[in-house]
A protein has these predicted regions:
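Extended catalytic core of nucleotide-activated donor transferases of GT-like folds
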Residues: 4-6, 24, 33-36, 41-119, ...
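A short, glycine/small-residue-rich beta-strand->loop->alpha-helix junction that serves as a flexible
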Residues: 6-20, 173-175
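Nucleotide-sugar-dependent
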Residues: 13, 175, 238-253, 265-272
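A charged, aromatic-enriched C-terminal amphipathic alpha-helix characteristic of glycosyltransferases
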Residues: 14, 284-287, 298-334
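Donor nucleotide-sugar binding/catalytic pocket of nucleotide-sugar-dependent glycosyltransferases
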Residues: 117-154
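Conserved catalytic-core segment of nucleotide-activated headgroup transferases in glycan assembly
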Residues: 149-224
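Conserved donor-binding/catalytic loop of nucleotide-activated donor transferases
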Residues: 231-233, 251-261, 265-266, 276
Length: 334
């Protein structure tokens, strides 16, 4: 069967990385074509290298034949409906499978669901599915989870003499709690480094009341590859702003695979991703965060043990390629 993946697979950003990993996972099961939004992407060296490995063509939507048979998969493209791309996909005769990935709808998405343009909607979690229950009432739905190629995030022992904690997320001020810098600093750790990606002027304005000292490293989006950034951290300390609910937690699982121990808040999907005290820590209040972090800081053998267990849990329970392959074959079958 023919599968048309709409977007730009790569290693920058969650949706692009997911598409790249799905190509590796499914290239033997589907005749894949990548449909890029702009002609310049066809010449992108990284994309060309990925697609040439699997003999996959890249075209623009306007260059596809007027009549096609197969499935179109679009992932987290905020302009997919407002640009008219969804309607154009349908006029060519393709079944449209859509995965939003977020906890909010994009412009034109609700109208497309109501009109019947979407043949199947995918969700990464039950939590996300419940959020969109009204919008997608009557639309066939499937829960896929989120596939991360575990070989891209191999476990690595940390050897930096300076204890480093940090976080990785998109540069949205709402992703950060209002007390973010104080949250880190009041842990009371000595000889520590804080690394944050992604940071922006807009995020910085939210904390203009705080003076960031030399122990802070605030990186713009994609300043480093996600994997290399995570290798630089001992702990993935991830307090989240009160206005945000996580649909899944891709960066948390990437951190686990590398051996970066996650310390995360309750009330999201993280209890589905890790076992508290074994493959990470889920905290209800600041005192719990402080106790967990200080123990991991002071007890290196314990930290190394949890680091190993994080990676093993993520690889076996969350990122098993064959299990995900079966899931996606079902999700894309009509």
């Amino acid at each position: 069967m023919s599968l048309y993946i709409l977007g730009v697979p790569g290693n920058i950003g969650g949706a692009s990385t997911k598409m790249a990993h799905l190509i590796r996972l499914l290239h033997k099961d589907f005749k894949i074509t990548v449909v890029v939004p702009e002609i310049g992407f066809v010449k992108d060296k990284q994309l060309k290298r990925l697609l040439e490995t699997y003999a996959i063509p890249a075209l623009m939507l306007k260059d596809l034949p007027k009549k096609l048979d197969g499935v179109a998969l679009a992932i987290c493209d905020r302009h997919f409906f407002s640009s008219g791309a969804a309607r154009e996909v349908k006029t060519r005769g393709l079944r449209l499978v859509w995965s939003n990935e977020m906890m909010f709808g994009f412009q034109g998405e609700a109208e497309a669901a109501k009109e019947g343009l979407i043949d199947r909607v995918l969700f990464v979690s039950e939590f996300q599915a419940n959020k969109f229950a009204d919008m997608y009432r009557g639309v066939p739905a499937f829960q896929t989870g989120n596939y991360i190629d575990p070989d891209d995030y191999a476990w690595r022992q940390r050897r930096d003499p300076i204890f480093t904690l940090g976080r990785l997320s998109r540069d949205d001020p709402q992703k950060y709690p209002l007390d973010f810098p104080v949250f880190y600093e009041e842990l009371g750790l000595k000889e520590v480094r804080y690394r944050v990606m992604a940071w922006s002027k807009e995020v910085g304005r939210q904390y203009r009341w705080h003076r960031f000292g030399p122990e802070w490293e605030l990186l713009s989006a994609n300043k480093e590859p996600a994997r290399e950034f995570l290798y630089s951290l001992d702990l993935f300390l991830y307090p989240i702003g009160h206005r945000i609910k996580e649909s899944w937690g891709r960066a948390v699982v990437e951190a686990m695979l590398t051996g970066c121990v996650p310390v995360v808040p309750a009330g999201h999907q993280f209890h589905k991703l890790l076992v508290h005290g074994e493959s990470g820590f889920i905290c209800q209040e600041y005192r719990e965060y402080k106790a967990c972090v200080r123990e991991l800081y002071a007890n290196h053998p314990f930290r190394r043990k949890i680091s190993r267990q994080c990676a093993e849990h993520a690889r076996a329970r969350l990122c098993d390629p064959e299990a995900h392959r079966r899931t996606w074959l079902e999700a894309l079958s009509f």
